[in-house]
Amino acid sequence: RDRLDSPVDLEFACDGEDLYLLQCRAQSHTEEFAPAPIPRHLPRELMLFSAHRSISNGRVPDITHIVYVDPDAYGALSERAQLIAVGETVGRLNKLLPKRQFILMGPGRWGSRGDVKLGVSVTYADINNTAVLLEIAKRKGNYLPELSFGTHFFQDLVEAEIRYIPLY
C-alpha cells in the first residue's frame, strides 16, 4: 500500500505450509467511483430500481441501452436449452451494443454453468462490453437466491472497470 500509494488487491495461495504472493496491484480509483449526488425528490416513474441494501458509490455516464432479463420469465423457462439460449442472446447483444454504454440486468448469478436455473449462463466474453453487471435476487416464497457478487468474473470485472451491482 505504501509503495503504490493506493489501496491494493492481493492474491495469494497457500500449500498448507508456505504462503505465496501471486499478484499485487493497485485498486483503481477514478471520479466515476466517487459518491454521486442522489436527487432527493425523483418522481417514481423515472426510477428504474431502488436499493434497500448496500450498493457501491459512483456514476456510470453515457448509458444508451439496458438489457433486462426478466427474473419471472427466466424462472418460468423449463428446458435447459431455453435457459442456455438466453445466455447466447446476451452474448450476441454484448457484441452488437456500443461498448461500455449498456447495462446488463438479470436474475441470480451471472456466469452459472452447472445449474443454469441459478442465473444466466454466460462466459466473460458474453458480458465484457457492458458498463454494469447487475444481479437481481428475487424472492420466491421463502427462498432468496444467493448472488455471486461478481465472483465468477471478479478480476476481469475489476480490470475492465465494469461495475457490479447486487439488487435485492
Short names for language-model regions:
Residues 1-168:
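Conserved divalent-metal-coordinating catalytic cores
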